[in-house]
């Protein structure tokens, strides 16, 4: 996560780069001599030690390569038209596609000794990609109701984290790369409080288990504890924007709404924390409260996690052992246990139940960055990774996972529904999927030109008992979304 907020111009450049994923080659009907005229002039204008025969052969090869790539470019366009036609036909039949985004990352070719071999390689890759798309169609008949209820729009940069307060009044918290954290009314979507005490990206937000306190971690190498007081506005009737969790219409960048308005400018602003936790030598990427709320843990890019006393701000333990930057930390809801995730492909379980000594266990099962690991109420830990898998672990048997979920995109900060044990997976490819602890897919949240995330989804958070929204997601489209998931219907159709 960046320590500084990304500018709007950077976002536009990123959008333009994504649109320009096709190979762009100037087309011409000129003769062979005209086609190679420009490179010839350029070479002749330079002091070259190459013999004229070698230069002539080289220029001829350039011309052949240009013609070959021009043909491949035309084939590329035709194949994309066929894929678009197939998608439209399937959408009309009510089917959905998992991971049907054909990006330039899927088109991987190696240099070959001849242009004809390169052509064959590209054709084979495109056929494989098309076959993958077709084979990924799901025949499941699940039509669980997944309603988009409310969009929370007000941040001026991507949102890294989302969390729900555990005390009354229940509010939603978001942490953003725009250096602020915002508190929202869940029912109305109105911004209630802005916290502007950090001078770097706010990377996480967590609420105290029993008081109106928030804990935020930042790229400014600190974590802040601050108190808030809010009064909820009168809720307005919620429009029904339901759509089946399995139906989807692909959206394009031009459908993205204008989010430049700063609704948080009217919010009461807090600029000074109650407590600032300072011991890290790098970005503080995540933080959480230990059970009871008297201690807090932070995770940093300096490869350590720190345990603090909240009242005194003193460092109690510095947890070392990870070989690379930490990405996340999470505490157990009822026991003094902490789990930390890292780019070193592992996550570690730290046990503080015995005050005199703390033990650590290392979980090795992923092949890429572990983006998050979270506890369930029982004896399980669920981990998500950039290797596109989610693994469920038993704390009593750490040798191998008891379930593995394989997906088509990197997974960010996951969250588990405590009562029903449903895992919400936010993906890099803008999707959000729901799985049970056995690895069975239950639903995919709707995403279309009218609703859903339009950029990477960074985090998910359940709030089971809330009558309006019981699942929240946030992403780098600068918005958080509140969903109503019909969990009984979801489990009934499993």
Swiss-Prot record:
Residues 245-263 have a biased composition (Acidic residues). It holds the Pfam family WD40. GO terms for cellular component: cytoplasm; nucleus. Disulfide bonds: none annotated. The keyword Hydrolase does not apply. Changing residue 220 to G: In NOCGUS; loss of interaction with PACS1 and PACS2; does not affect homodimerization; does not affect subcellular location to cytoplasm. Its main location: cytoplasm. SMART domains: WD40. Changing residue 125 to I: In NOCGUS; no effect on interaction with PACS1 and PACS2; does not affect homodimerization. It is linked to Neurooculocardiogenitourinary syndrome: An autosomal dominant multisystem disorder characterized by significant neurological impairment with structural brain defects and seizures, poor feeding, poor postnatal growth, ocular anomalies, dysmorphic facial features, and variable skeletal, cardiac and genitourinary defects. Death in infancy may occur. Required for normal ER Ca2+ handling in lymphocytes. Together with PACS1, it plays an essential role in stabilizing peripheral lymphocyte populations. PANTHER family: WD REPEAT-CONTAINING PROTEIN 37 (PTHR19855:SF12), WD40 REPEAT PROTEIN 12, 37 (PTHR19855). Forms homodimers. Interacts with PACS1. Interacts with PACS2. This is WD repeat-containing protein 37. It comes from Homo sapiens. The gene is WDR37.
